[in-house]
Structure formats: C-alpha cells, structure tokens
C-alpha cells in the first residue's frame, strides 16, 4: 500500500484554458505535488472530444516516463475527455487516482443549445455518452475514482448527471459551476482524494 504523491495532470473544460486551474495548481504545488496541465485546442466545442482526448494522451506520453504512474483531474468537459482517455485510450493502465469534477458524465441538457460537434457529444442521448457509460463500471472501478459535484450547477443539467455510482461521490454546495475549481472545500476534497492509498 502506498500514498506517494504522483504527478497530477489537470484537464480543463469548454471555453477554458490552463488558467482556470490557477488556484488548484498553486495549492497542490505548495502541498508538494508536481502539477501539469495543457491547453486543449480548440476549446469551444468545434472538435470532437475524441480529438481532444488524443491531445491529452500525446501530452502524457511525451511528459512522463512509461513507468511513471500519474493522477488525473478532469473538470466539466475535461471530465469526459479524461474518461475517454481512461476508458478508450488505455489511460487506465497509467492512472492510479482519478478525480472528476462537475462533468456531464450522463450528459447535460445545456448541450442542446449549440450544434457544434463536441457540444453535441455532451447531450444526454449522444452516442459518445452512451458508449462511455456502457462499460464505465467495469473500466473505472479498476482505479481510485472520486466524483465531486454541486447540486446548484447550472451548466450540468441535471446537476446529478456527474454521478455514475462509481467510487467516492462528494457533494459540495458550491453556488456556481466555475467556482468548483476555486472553492476551498473542493480543494480540500481533491487533496484528500490524491492521498488515498493505492493497494
């Protein structure tokens, strides 16, 4: 059993860049973690999520040695991108701890507002969501998973769409979706999840 601090990769969401993680990055770095993140391009929904997941996979391959385990945090759309990496690009073999924050894991009705390919994939009835969810229990239960959500989320509708019945599910009553990567209660939950022992 080990509680070593793995490098942490942060994956942002729609319209975001790495700067959305400034608070988390600073907090984790000050607590002894090696923190990494990348800008997904394009970030506004014009590319399918598989394309962005390939960017993530390439970044990880070029950043870490093959034998270096890592932990991943995916926020919002980044939660789906990280899940595709884990479930479809063999990321499950690389990642030991996974934190999914306010992601549309079962889709969000907000995604019906725009017809862009990456946004369409976030609809509750999309083939992308259906595909990821048909084997998520089997795949994600192989690693330590934590799902953090707020019932007040107006971007993930319904807010409970983040939950998959896997791993630890933590409800934190943060008022705004964007504050989920800034709230001190969320930061505390993240650090606790990153310190969970690996068998």
Give short role names for the model-derived ranges.
Residues 40-47, 174-176:
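A short, charged, and often flexible helix/loop element on the N-terminal side
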């Amino acid at each position: 059993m080990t509680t070593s601090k793995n490098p942490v990769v942060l994956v942002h969401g729609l319209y975001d860049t790495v700067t959305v993680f400034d608070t988390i990055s600073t907090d984790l770095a000050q607590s002894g973690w090696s923190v990494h993140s990348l800008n997904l391009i394009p970030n506004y929904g014009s590319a399918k999520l598989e394309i962005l997941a390939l960017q993530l996979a390439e970044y990880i391959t070029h950043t870490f040695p093959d034998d270096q385990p890592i932990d991943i945090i995916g926020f919002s759309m980044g939660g789906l991108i990280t899940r595709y990496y884990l479930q479809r690009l063999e990321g499950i073999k690389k990642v030991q701890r996974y934190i999914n924050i306010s992601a549309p894991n079962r889709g969000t009705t907000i995604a019906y507002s725009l017809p862009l390919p990456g946004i369409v994939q976030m609809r509750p009835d999309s083939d992308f969501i259906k595909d990821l969810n048909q084997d998520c229990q089997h795949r994600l239960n192989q690693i330590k998973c934590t799902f953090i959500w707020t019932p007040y989320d107006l971007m993930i509708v319904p807010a409970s769409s983040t939950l998959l019945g896997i791993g630890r599910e933590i409800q934190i009553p943060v008022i705004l979706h964007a504050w989920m990567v800034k709230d001190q209660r969320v930061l505390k939950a993240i650090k606790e999840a990153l310190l969970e022992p690996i068998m």
